[in-house]
A protein has these predicted regions:
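…; additionally, a secondary subgroup of soluble metalloenzymes is captured
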Residues: 1-151
Length: 151
């Protein structure tokens, strides 16, 4: 990204071993803020996995490769439209963090977020990850060399 515009979806042709360093950093600095709920897993090159325990699958995520040279903010995650309200609803009045706190540091197996809670969490992770990744030494060095940062 550059000035709020998606430049490329592949993190500047990121290599898997470099991505692994960044994924571990995201787990340390970001996933650790959501214990028992969020985990990043290294995949291949720029393709990785995010696990959200108790997340709701009825959200719309815009694939960045479908939106080059577009602003990213209008593409933030939203609950799906036209889906039965029962599918969008969670099964608990508590927030995920409250459930984790009440269950000894892990999310209860029965807990399911609403689609809105899941979208909000994903958007929070997107925003925070940009800040975290921008200051990582790997990206600072890439920027100094005139290369695209992986963000």
């Amino acid at each position: 990204m550059n000035n709020g515009i998606i430049v490329t979806h592949n993190g500047g042709n990121l290599e898997t071993e470099d991505a692994d360093v960044l994924i571990k950093y995201l787990n340390e600095k970001l996933a650790s803020q959501y214990p028992g709920i969020v985990k990043f897993i290294t995949g291949i090159q720029y393709r990785h996995l995010l696990i959200i325990k108790g997340g709701n699958k009825y959200v719309d995520c815009a694939p960045p490769h479908d939106h080059p040279n577009e602003e990213w903010k209008p593409l933030l995650v939203k609950p799906m439209e036209g889906v039965d309200e029962a599918l969008l609803a969670g099964n608990c009045d508590k927030t995920p963090a409250e459930d984790v706190a009440e269950n000894g540091g892990i999310l209860s197996d029965e807990y399911r977020m609403s689609a809105q809670q899941t979208a909000d969490l994903l958007n929070e992770l997107i925003l925070k990850s940009q800040e975290i990744l921008e200051s990582h030494p790997f990206n600072v060095a890439r920027k100094e060399r005139g290369e695209r940062m992986a963000n």
